[in-house]
Amino acid sequence: MPFITKISTQKKNTERFNIFLDDKYAFSVDADVLVKFELKKGKELDDLDIIEIQYGDEVKKGFNRALDFLSYRMRSTKEVEDHLKKKETSPPVIAEVIHRLNDYKYLNDQEFAAAYVSTHKKTNGKGPDVLFRELRAKGIDDDTIKEALSSFSFEDQTREAVKHVEKLLKKDKKLSTKELKQRAQLQLQRKGFSFDVISAAMDQIEYENDEDTEKEALRLHAEKAFRKYRYDGSYESAMKVKQFLFRKGFSLDLIEQLLQEEEY
């Protein structure tokens, strides 16, 4: 059986050590692995010893990678597993790393799910349906997700939905009242809010344009329609413009009024 004839510190990483067996480089280990297996000059190692030492070193590498990954933000168990897989860590090592992370309480899917809901419902205005799908994609089980979402009350959901629509109304001044309402409802659906929450939010919002704002929005769309259909005052071009503007949600009375104005 070979003997350890030399142990040297790596130049680029002083926490790792090169192990030489019978005067030939054999492998390297982390400082903690060196201490754990009591590696020192003159120690005899058989094949099983070497396999055990190298496995322990792979676990240490995986553990360090996981800690670095966790240092940026909280992660789910699946996120850590996926990260280690990308680093070509073997399944047995991943399982051991996850076990240790749980022992040290670096991983907790219940706490992760609760924090995820708390953060994303406020910063991104996401509704329960979207949060549910995202957490499931991160490997959180349905019961844990439901428990986390229980803190997102109907009142809180409605409040976040109202905030989202109010931002939309400030941004989209070029839309008709009808389009504003439709777009608001669609965006809330995409954000993951239920029909009941959307209805409650829409009831709280004043999305009706004042007359001047509605007319200004109509004029902007009319200019596009005039160019698109080459409006020349003829019946045919006027009908195409009217249909275009009506589909955009403007009233026929307002459209007729615009077309009758002298400049048109």
From Swiss-Prot:
The keyword rRNA-binding does not apply. Coiled coil: none annotated. The keyword Cytoplasm applies. Disruption phenotype: A single recX deletion rapidly increases RecA expression after DNA damage. It is found in: Cytoplasm. GO terms for cellular component: cytoplasm. Signal peptide: none annotated. Keywords: Cytoplasm. GO terms for biological process: regulation of DNA repair. Belongs to the RecX family. Negatively modulates RecA activity. This is Regulatory protein RecX. The gene is recX.
